[in-house]
């Protein structure tokens, strides 16, 4: 490298350092709020992040998602199609059916809780209490009394006089148990016609001496065409929605 090139390189470096010096010397400040409100805002932020991380679990616990996704899973098992429809399709269908069933509850929670809280009209505690009311009413409408009594006894808490005063730590697991029971009841009814098809196909194969041919392979097309002819997806989706009185 020539002496002239070295001088030009040194001049460029010095120019860069002189230009970057004032920028590097500027103070960097972050506004965390005024006075004692910092701790409260940090706690609110942590609580918000926690709620967002638990949102899928909350969706499963307090909505109709549990019953719907279990019924769809049992339906796929009854049909004998291990991977069709795939899990992503089943979960997506269950999610949108849940949004359809829970639409009024979500709208009420937003109008009475989230919107006033966003406008600064109510506190976070008031917003949670108002937003949880429609979901509490939904769970009370669909929970079994036997399951409520079970978890009330396990908690060893005095039973409230009004159903609206039942704690969520009692109501939520009782509701989930009730949903699983109803999902299995619906699944049993879905299994019956496909079980009959399997038995008929197995009997025909045995009478023809074709015992080496798996009956499941032969019965699968018959179960699929039967499900299509009776418009099975419409019946299942409609029955699931109507089971909530919608």
Can you name each region flagged by the protein language model?
Residues 24-246:
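Hydrophobic alpha-helical segments and their helix-loop boundaries in membrane
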Residues 1-25:
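N-terminal secretory/membrane targeting signals
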């Amino acid at each position: 490298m020539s002496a002239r090139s070295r001088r030009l390189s040194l001049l460029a470096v010095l120019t860069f350092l002189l230009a970057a010096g004032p920028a590097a010397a500027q103070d960097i400040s972050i506004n965390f709020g005024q006075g004692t409100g910092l701790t409260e805002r940090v706690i609110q932020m942590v609580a918000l992040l926690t709620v967002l991380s638990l949102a899928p679990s909350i969706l499963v616990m307090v909505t109709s998602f549990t019953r719907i996704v279990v019924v769809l899973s049992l339906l796929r098992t009854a049909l004998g199609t291990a991977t069709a429809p795939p899990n992503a399709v089943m979960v997506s269908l269950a999610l949108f059916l849940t949004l359809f069933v829970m639409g009024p509850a979500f709208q009420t929670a937003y109008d009475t809780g989230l919107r006033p809280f966003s406008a600064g009209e109510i506190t976070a505690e008031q917003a949670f209490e108002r937003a949880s009311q429609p979901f509490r009413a939904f769970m009370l409408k669909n929970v079994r009394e036997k399951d409520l009594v079970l978890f009330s006894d396990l908690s060893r808490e005095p039973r409230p006089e009004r159903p609206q005063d039942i704690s969520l730590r009692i109501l939520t697991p009782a509701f989930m148990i009730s949903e699983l029971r109803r999902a299995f009841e619906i699944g049993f009814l879905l299994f019956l016609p496909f079980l009959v098809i399997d038995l008929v196909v197995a009997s025909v194969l045995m009478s023809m001496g074709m015992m080496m041919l798996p009956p499941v392979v032969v019965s699968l097309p018959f179960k699929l065409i039967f499900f299509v002819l009776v418009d099975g997806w419409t019946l299942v989706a409609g029955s699931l929605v109507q089971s909530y009185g919608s």
